[in-house]
From Swiss-Prot:
It comes from Aspergillus sp. (strain MF297-2). Keywords: Oxidoreductase. GO terms for molecular function: oxidoreductase activity. Baeyer-Villiger oxidase; part of the gene cluster that mediates the biosynthesis of notoamide, a fungal indole alkaloid that belongs to a family of natural products containing a characteristic bicyclo[2.2.2]diazaoctane core. The first step of notoamide biosynthesis involves coupling of L-proline and L-tryptophan by the bimodular NRPS notE, to produce cyclo-L-tryptophan-L-proline called brevianamide F. Belongs to the questin oxidase family. The lineage of its organism: Eukaryota, Fungi, Dikarya, Ascomycota, Pezizomycotina. This is Baeyer-Villiger oxidase notM. Its EC number is 1.-.-.-. The keyword Iron-sulfur does not apply. Notoamides have been shown to exhibit antitumoral activities. Notoamides A-C show moderate cytotoxicity against HeLa and L1210 cells with IC(50) values in the range of 22-52 mg/ml, but the IC(50) value of notoamide D is greater than 100 mg/ml. Moreover, notoamide C induces G2/M-cell cycle arrest at a concentration of 6.3 mg/ml.
């Protein structure tokens, strides 16, 4: 069997993505390989120096997993490549490609992310930097078993400014392990972030892309650490804890959850590291919730939503509609993550502890419809999404839902 080099893209029918509903047409995998290889060989991982991540791989792979064909894949690529920068001289990407070629991608991830050496600890934290982009990218690479995309994700992590999240993670973990704070359901911790004056007011619109670093991690570090440390997963509850994190991410509608579903299924990753992956993701979600103004979470806003463009659509129809939207991949990632969340969360939505899972039943589809209805028009992401849902200023361009 030919071993795939870390500079090559070669998708196969054996790995075509989570939350898939329909098969892809003939020729889809071949075109996806061509587009992803072109992106890998031609474009910078950042289209601007701060807060500008290349989303082409995310978009193409999401559309592929959602059953899109050549037309939809070309749309996804064309919507993303026009503003990309050419590749510069590379260090991190070439380093991780050579390491993967020599050792294999699983061994490289074990060494550089999970070995608990000082370097691995720094890299593990860095996976969550840049609004989660490195771990999202890594998740795509593992999901589709593509060493080239795994190398890109590791290079993403290695090249990001830490932004003080390493201090936040380590302090939260130390406090959780001390036994001095009780474990609480994640949905209650979101409520605590909003009730606490310091965490609720720590974020500032004017902090821009540094809203987390200069917001809760600067103005309310002690408070957000204390709250975040209370999300704790027992070894026997990893599946439930993952579902709880995904459910609350959907409730807040601000954090993508897909990589967790991929990573917790990797038996070659030690159980304690898989638990850590989910705990850190949920804790960072709480910090980002504070950074974005801790908007009031009201279930009635979801259950009472009346779909517009998506009225009457079920998941199959919604997938098809999303694949045709001009976008850089955010709405496709969002909708696929919700469909995956529906599946992962379902076993825990009834019975003991069900209150920890606010999103239930058809609310998963309803949130996906909200996402599609409000982002289907236009190209500019600044007009598609509310950047800071807890700030009144961020809603000025948005019509009242009532």
């Amino acid at each position: 069997m030919t071993i795939l080099k870390a500079s090559q893209v070669k998708l196969t029918a054996r790995r075509t993505g989570l939350a898939r509903l329909d098969p892809s047409p003939t020729g889809t995998l071949e075109l996806a390989n061509e587009l992803l290889q072109r992106n890998h060989d031609s474009y910078h991982m950042y289209f601007r120096d701060v807060g500008g991540h290349n989303h082409i791989a995310h978009s193409v792979l999401s559309v592929l997993a959602m059953g899109g064909g050549p037309k939809e894949l070309n749309r996804a690529y064309d919507d993303g490549y026009g503003y990309q920068r050419p590749l510069p001289a590379l260090n991190f990407l070439h380093f991780f490609e050579s390491e993967i070629d020599a050792k294999g991608w699983q061994a490289v991830l074990q060494e550089y992310c999970f070995s608990r050496t000082p370097l691995a600890e720094a890299m593990f934290s860095q996976l969550y930097e840049g609004l989660l982009h490195p771990i999202i990218h890594l998740g795509f690479g593992i999901e589709f078993e593509q060493p080239s995309i795994i190398a890109e994700g590791l290079a993403h992590a290695a090249s990001h400014d830490p932004g003080n999240i390493d201090t936040f993670f380590l302090r939260s973990e130390e406090l959780a392990r001390s036994g001095s704070v009780p474990a609480k359901p994640l949905v209650e911790l979101y409520e605590e972030v909003r009730r606490n004056e310091k965490t609720r007011t720590a974020g500032r619109m004017q902090d821009g892309p540094f809203r987390l670093r200069d917001g809760p991690l600067a103005r309310s570090m002690d408070e957000i650490v204390h709250i975040a440390a209370q999300f704790q997963i027992k070894p026997e509850d990893l599946e439930r804890g993952t579902a709880e994190m995904i459910n609350c991410a959907a409730y807040s509608a601000g954090r993508r959850s897909g990589p967790a579903s991929v990573l917790v299924k990797q038996s070659w990753i030690k159980l304690e590291d898989r638990i850590r992956l989910v705990e850190w993701k949920a804790r960072l979600d709480l910090a980002w919730y504070a950074a974005n103004g801790a908007a009031e979470l009201r279930l009635e806003d979801i259950s009472g939503y009346e779909p517009t463009a998506s009225k009457g659509m079920e998941w199959h129809a919604l997938y098809k509609a999303v694949n045709e939207v001009h976008d850089d991949g955010h709405i496709a990632k969002f909708v696929r993550a919700l469909k995956n969340g529906e599946t992962v969360s379902a076993p825990f939505e009834q019975g003991d502890g069900a209150d920890a899972f606010p999103i239930k039943g058809d609310l998963w589809l309803r949130i996906a419809q909200m996402g599609y209805d409000t982002t289907k028009d236009g190209h500019d992401n600044s007009d598609k999404w509310v950047w800071g849902a807890g700030f009144d200023l961020a809603w000025m361009k948005v019509p009242d839902s009532q």
